[in-house]
């Protein structure tokens, strides 16, 4: 498997999401945070995480509970959902639109991804009379609070896995990408 291929990207993103570390016997990894450090989720904590990683983002003027950013030319939103606003949702939109005549084909590609992977959830949504958007999202439940590292990992996992899906979609469609957005 060569770097850059879809399975490789998914494997790398999974390792990144899970923060896999290899240690020798009788050796432990250093834990910077402890369970005592759980703090309630807030949009400010999401902003702090994005800032810590040097990611540029903007606050949505129309929706003050949403942060927006671009990664690899894909649009992303970060928001807190749920009754207690404790579920962090990272949602990305593919940078192409699809004619409604290709709906079944694109839904099949999304369903194939969803059947073979735990995350992110991917789907197709009608955006106008004749155009569809393709989305990927990952939700992390932090209703009991979270460590900074958990927030950081949830954002990194959401970004890397959604982008892996978009790249997989582009690879599958190949030359047909030129026909989109027309």
Predicted regions span which residues?
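Charge-rich, low-complexity N-terminal segments
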Residues: 2-81
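Short, ordered beta-strand-loop transition motifs
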Residues: 58-63, 82-84, 125-132
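Long, continuous compositionally biased terminal/linker segments
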Residues: 71-107
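Short, internal acidic amphipathic alpha-helical interface segments
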Residues: 92-137
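A short acidic/glycine-rich loop-to-helix N-cap element
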Residues: 142-155
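Glycine-rich, aromatic-bearing surface loops/beta-hairpins
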Residues: 157-164
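Short, highly charged C-terminal tails/helix-capping segments
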Residues: 170-182
């Amino acid at each position: 498997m060569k770097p850059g291929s879809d399975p490789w990207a998914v494997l790398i993103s999974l390792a990144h999401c899970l923060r896999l570390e290899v240690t020798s016997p009788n050796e432990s990894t250093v834990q910077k945070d402890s369970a005592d450090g759980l703090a309630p989720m807030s949009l400010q904590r999401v902003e702090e995480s994005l800032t810590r990683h040097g990611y540029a983002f903007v606050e949505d003027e129309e929706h003050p509970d949403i942060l927006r950013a671009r990664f690899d030319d894909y649009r992303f939103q970060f928001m807190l959902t749920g009754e207690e606003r404790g579920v962090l949702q990272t949602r990305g939109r593919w940078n192409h639109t699809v004619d409604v005549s290709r709906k079944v084909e694109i839904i099949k590609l999304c369903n194939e991804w969803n059947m073979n992977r735990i995350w992110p959830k991917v789907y197709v949504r009608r955006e106008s009379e004749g155009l569809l958007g393709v989305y990927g999202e990952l939700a992390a439940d932090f209703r009991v609070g979270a460590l900074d590292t958990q927030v950081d990992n949830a954002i990194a996992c959401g970004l890397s896995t959604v982008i892996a899906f978009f790249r997989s979609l582009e690879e599958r469609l190949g030359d047909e990408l030129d026909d989109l957005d027309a």
